[in-house]
């Protein structure tokens, strides 16, 4: 029987540790960790994600500061807010909820976030530290995936790993993390020739292409580990029902694999949990506290 990599279960276990970490240090810091989330516009999915982050913060004892800005605001005003939050000592972590409306210069806004508060790990300084394998903020979804693999003692070193997708959020940073952990990494994308053949050579196959049900059993070798990063809401042909699925046709793949992540309940919960880890790590760093979280930051 295939092993389910239960991200929801692992995330709750890590959250318990985070809660205890905050409780044991709050007397010396005199304040909880603080996370600022900047949301621009009315993208409905962003609203759900921000609410999930707010709830997760509350569960472990992080104080969240939500800045919901109308899309009529201009670039300069958002930049001013980021600069203000950079100087706010009650804010340990900050993120720009993506996507944002096209009129904004997304990369410039991210580059303005203090690298020590960049809990999404997207600032170029943190990307550079990842490239050089130096300590720094790590992108949440890739870090969550590494922790899922480690939780079940799945070996990364020396394994053939194929990442389908090259986004700055997942594909690129994840490939670098796995390379730093001595995996033999191949990164593929929409222009890759013979994708199926390449995928079938993988000991660990990670689907982060953003295409529903792209990967079926013909892409996967027997005994592989498959990580599904995608999440999509599909509507039935008569529009009477919707269901969530990932980039992997799981019911087709599960009989062949050693381990897999479900959708939902796999990678998603770990992404939010790693955001909490990064925020608390920044808080501990500011107060020069002994951190027990470094093993969670690949």
From Swiss-Prot:
Homodimer. Belongs to the tetrahydrofolate dehydrogenase/cyclohydrolase family. SUPFAM superfamilies: Aminoacid dehydrogenase-like, N-terminal domain, NAD(P)-binding Rossmann-fold domains. This is Bifunctional protein FolD. It catalyses: (6R)-5,10-methylene-5,6,7,8-tetrahydrofolate + NADP(+) = (6R)-5,10-methenyltetrahydrofolate + NADPH; (6R)-5,10-methenyltetrahydrofolate + H2O = (6R)-10-formyltetrahydrofolate + H(+). Pathway: One-carbon metabolism; tetrahydrofolate interconversion. Pfam families: THF_DHG_CYH, THF_DHG_CYH_C. NADP(+) binds at residues 165-167, 190, 231. GO terms for biological process: L-histidine biosynthetic process; methionine biosynthetic process; purine nucleotide biosynthetic process; tetrahydrofolate interconversion. The lineage of its organism: Bacteria, Bacillati, Cyanobacteriota, Cyanophyceae, Synechococcales. GO terms for cellular component: cytosol. InterPro entries: Aminoacid_DH-like_N_sf, NAD(P)-bd_dom_sf, THF_DH/CycHdrlase, THF_DH/CycHdrlase_cat_dom, THF_DH/CycHdrlase_CS, THF_DH/CycHdrlase_NAD-bd_dom. GO terms for molecular function: methenyltetrahydrofolate cyclohydrolase activity; methylenetetrahydrofolate dehydrogenase (NADP+) activity. Catalyzes the oxidation of 5,10-methylenetetrahydrofolate to 5,10-methenyltetrahydrofolate and then the hydrolysis of 5,10-methenyltetrahydrofolate to 10-formyltetrahydrofolate. Its EC number is 1.5.1.5, 3.5.4.9. It comes from the Bacteria. It comes from Prochlorococcus marinus (strain MIT 9515). Keywords: Amino-acid biosynthesis, Histidine biosynthesis, Hydrolase, Methionine biosynthesis, Multifunctional enzyme, NADP, One-carbon metabolism, Oxidoreductase, Purine biosynthesis.
